[in-house]
């Protein structure tokens, strides 16, 4: 009897172990729908079976000077990876489309902008500051999150040239089917405001 109970327990544990990754896979592959600056819906991570295409989200705030200073570098990186999709995500949930479009006119990033009023992409990536990058596979796996480079040492203090180009190196590694190295330090930048509850 005891041996039978042990066997049943082992079988159940094996079943849980097999089921676990399936549940995790489903959780990480949930589709995300946001809108671009023209009000058009954009769907991400719809294909759970495709791992070929990379999607890079750069989280920005219009009034963050560090974000705006990275425009030339981000345009350079974008041109270096023409097969990769780049988007800037306006992370402030209260930002209007008109405000985002105005910022887009003043700072030409060279790739599309997205509104994230419900902070779906913020939560999915775990981004906390701007500018911060998140790299996903097209099936919704987070492959990298962190700074663009280490140009900024602190607020108001930066190097002429970065010592580590973290985002660029991460993309190169991923495209070679290698794991990307995540920075030990969070990006220097502006904190992403959290969405307020409607009842507060």
Regions from the language model: what does each represent?
Residues 9-21:
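Bacterial N-terminal signal peptides
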Residues 61-71, 93-94, 133, 190-193, ...:
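Short, thiol/selenol-centered motifs that function as redox-active sites or metal-ligating centers
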Residues 137-138, 142-200:
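Thiol-/selenol-based redox modules, centered on thioredoxin-like
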Residues 103-145:
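Short, internal strand/loop/helix patches
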Residues 68-107, 115-124:
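Structural microenvironment flanking redox-active thiols in thiol-disulfide oxidoreductases
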Residues 48-68, 171:
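Short active-site neighborhood of thiol/selenol oxidoreductases, capturing the structured segment around
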Residues 32-55:
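A short beta-strand-turn-helix
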Residues 24-26:
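Boundary at the C-terminal end of the N-terminal hydrophobic targeting segment
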């Amino acid at each position: 009897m005891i041996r039978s109970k042990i066997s049943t327990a082992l079988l159940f544990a094996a079943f849980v172990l097999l089921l676990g990754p399936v549940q995790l896979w489903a959780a990480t592959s949930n589709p995300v729908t946001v809108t671009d600056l023209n009000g058009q819906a954009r769907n991400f991570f719809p294909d759970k079976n495709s791992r070929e295409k990379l999607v890079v989200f750069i989280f920005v705030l219009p009034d963050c000077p560090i974000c705006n200073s990275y425009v030339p570098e981000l345009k350079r990186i974008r041109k270096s990876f023409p097969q990769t999709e780049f988007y800037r995500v306006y992370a402030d949930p209260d930002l209007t489309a008109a405000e985002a479009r105005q910022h887009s006119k003043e700072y030409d990033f060279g790739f599309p902008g997205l509104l994230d009023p419900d902070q779906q992409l913020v939560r999915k990536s775990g981004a906390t500051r701007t500018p911060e990058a998140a790299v996903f596979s097209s099936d919704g796996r987070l492959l990298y999150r962190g700074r663009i480079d280490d140009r900024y040492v602190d607020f108001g203090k930066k190097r002429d040239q970065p010592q580590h180009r973290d985002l660029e190196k991460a993309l190169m590694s991923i495209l070679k089917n290698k794991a990307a190295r995540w920075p030990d330090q969070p990006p220097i930048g502006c904190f992403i405001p959290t969405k307020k509850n409607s009842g507060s």
